[in-house]
Design a protein with these regions (language model features):
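Low-complexity, intrinsically disordered or signal/transmembrane-proximal segments
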Residues: 2-5, 22
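Bacterial N-terminal signal peptides that target proteins for export
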Residues: 4-16
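Bacterial N-terminal signal peptides
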Residues: 15-25
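A structured, mid-to-C-terminal "fold-capping" secondary-structure block
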Residues: 32-35, 144-260
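N-terminal targeting signals for Sec/Tat export/insertion, comprising classic cleavable signal peptides
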Residues: 37-64
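Membrane interface segments of multi-pass transport proteins and intramembrane proteases
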Residues: 57-75, 127, 138
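Beta-rich strand-turn-strand
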Residues: 78-80
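Mid-length scaffold segments of soluble, non-membrane domains
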Residues: 83, 92-162
Length: 260
């Protein structure tokens, strides 16, 4: 799926990008300091307010409607979207030196994409290939010791950091096979719109799983912006360090907990 030349090419690009990040990141040079600076707080808060308004008029209503779909449709959609995420997770497993996870995720992708009908079903789970944690280029940078840089809130996309934003750019410059197939090589069968539709689907799927959690956080937070910032940074730190600490939001395997 990813030959050695591709992996080495991506690794070289990441090393070069790390050097650029060191120039871009405005963060503490003291290794012991863990606090991430909110360098652009005024802009971030304005963007956060915009995102919340957009959520109330668009994403929350769509997610609420999505929750009313029959559970097999929700499970199938979530499985298919999770299967696509392996195309980013696998190269990052390799870059992080986690070849066991790379092998499991590769096997899961092949089995679920074929026997599982483009990932709608998860026969790999029945074969003992358990779902692994997702990885991305932001997490890979973190394992390489790159600091988060300033906290960011991106329009529509939500919480991020300089490190994670650069990681996303890596995905769109050759590090995401799904992006390459659909956007860069728009064909008769797989088009650019398929990529953006899948990303929208991931957002709606995540939002639908967290309707109650988000409502509770907003209701009980003195400063909802600060709460979301804290949860995001904690979650990213947990994922980078492969910790088992759970946050208040749900992942791809949590539909059972939402069933009445």
């Amino acid at each position: 799926m990813y030959n050695i030349q591709t992996v080495m090419f991506i690794r070289v690009k990441i090393i070069i990008t790390i050097l650029l990040i060191q120039l871009m990141v405005v963060s503490s040079s003291i290794a012991e300091e863990k606090e991430v600076k909110d360098c652009f707080e005024k802009i971030n808060r304005a963007t956060f307010a915009f995102n919340m308004a957009l959520d109330k008029v668009l994403f929350r209503p769509v997610a609420t409607g999505y929750r009313k779909l029959p559970s097999p449709i929700r499970y199938g959609t979530s499985n298919a979207l999770n299967n696509l995420s392996n195309l980013v997770t696998i190269p990052n497993n390799i870059l992080q030196g986690d070849f066991r996870a790379a092998g499991i995720n590769s096997a899961r992708f092949i089995i679920n994409s074929t026997i599982g009908i483009v990932g709608i079903f998860d026969p790999a789970q029945s074969l003992g290939l358990d779902k692994m944690e997702k990885e991305d280029y932001g997490q890979t940078f973190g394992t390489m010791g790159v600091g988060e840089g300033c906290y960011l809130v991106l329009p529509v996309l939500g919480p991020s950091t300089v490190r994670d934003a650069v990681g996303s750019l890596i995905s769109m410059s050759g590090g995401d096979a799904w992006y390459n197939i659909t956007v860069k090589n728009d064909t008769q069968y797989l088009k650019e719109s398929d990529y953006y539709f899948s990303k929208l689907g991931q957002g709606v799927d995540f939002r639908a799983k967290n309707l109650e959690a988000f409502d509770s956080l907003e209701k009980n937070s003195v400063d909802f912006y600060a709460t979301v910032r804290s949860l995001y940074l904690q979650d990213r730190d947990r994922k980078i360090n492969n910790q088992d600490i759970k946050t208040d939001t749900l992942d791809d395997s949590d539909w059972d907990s939402l069933e009445n």
